[in-house]
């Protein structure tokens, strides 16, 4: 059990300190696989035997939260036994992950890694389009939102494929009732996420391709070794 604990801790460290987008995504997928293979939850690696408590982990997003980041937060949270909500104050905007034990911390790490990867890939896309003579596409209405939705959609597909390959994982990532009760107690106001988009299908397709390549990182096995 000690060796498994150490592996899990190493993977969590990889997620938060990954040098590249591929390493971060591969590590997060490796974490899911290792937990399921050993019939474990993240709280099982705690040093004490006390019941896992529901905690919150906030990510500071500055003065504004792009709508696509709200969508990304929900996708990541659902796949790490968490719920997520956005918080607004005079000091800035945050997305908050709610989960048992270390779940919220891991979800937060994966969210930051995925958001950074998406931003980097979008900049690469914009540079490529400019080199092809299409100008500064990042300033064109709806382009970034559409591209990001494609990226997020493919990440969601990567999660779904991993679950479909191992039926036990479907149970492993179910959000605990304690987390749902915590969210109910907060009494949040429900708002609809509105991402500004464009009708150009090629923009979303490019985002999807980039996100899928990121989501299916080829270093999963190495990260879990």
Language-model regions, residue ranges each:
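Long alpha-helical, hydrophobic tracts
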Residues: 1-54
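Extended, helix-rich structural scaffolds rather than catalytic motifs
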Residues: 2, 40-225
């Amino acid at each position: 059990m000690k060796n498994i604990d150490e592996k899990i801790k190493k993977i969590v460290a990889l997620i938060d300190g990954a040098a590249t987008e591929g390493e971060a995504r591969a590590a997060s997928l490796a974490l899911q696989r290792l937990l399921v293979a050993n019939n474990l939850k993240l709280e099982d690696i705690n040093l004490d035997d006390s019941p896992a408590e529901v905690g919150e982990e906030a990510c500071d997003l500055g003065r504004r939260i792009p709508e696509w980041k709200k969508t990304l937060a929900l996708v990541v949270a659902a796949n790490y036994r968490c719920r997520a909500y956005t918080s607004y104050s005079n000091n800035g905007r945050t997305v908050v992950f709610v989960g048992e034990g270390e779940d919220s911390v891991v979800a937060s790490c994966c969210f930051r890694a995925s958001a950074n990867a998406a931003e980097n890939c979008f900049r690469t896309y914009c540079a490529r389009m400019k080199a092809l003579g299409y100008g500064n596409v990042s300033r064109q209405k709806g382009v970034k939102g559409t591209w990001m939705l494609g990226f997020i959609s493919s990440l969601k597909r990567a999660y779904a494929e991993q679950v479909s390959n191992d039926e036990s994982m479907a149970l492993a990532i179910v959000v605990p009732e304690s987390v749902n009760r915590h969210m109910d107690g907060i009494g949040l106001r429900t708002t609809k996420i509105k991402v500004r988009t464009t009708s150009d299908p090629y923009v979303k397709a490019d985002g999807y391709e980039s996100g899928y390549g990121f989501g299916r990182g080829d270093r999963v096995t190495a990260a879990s070794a």
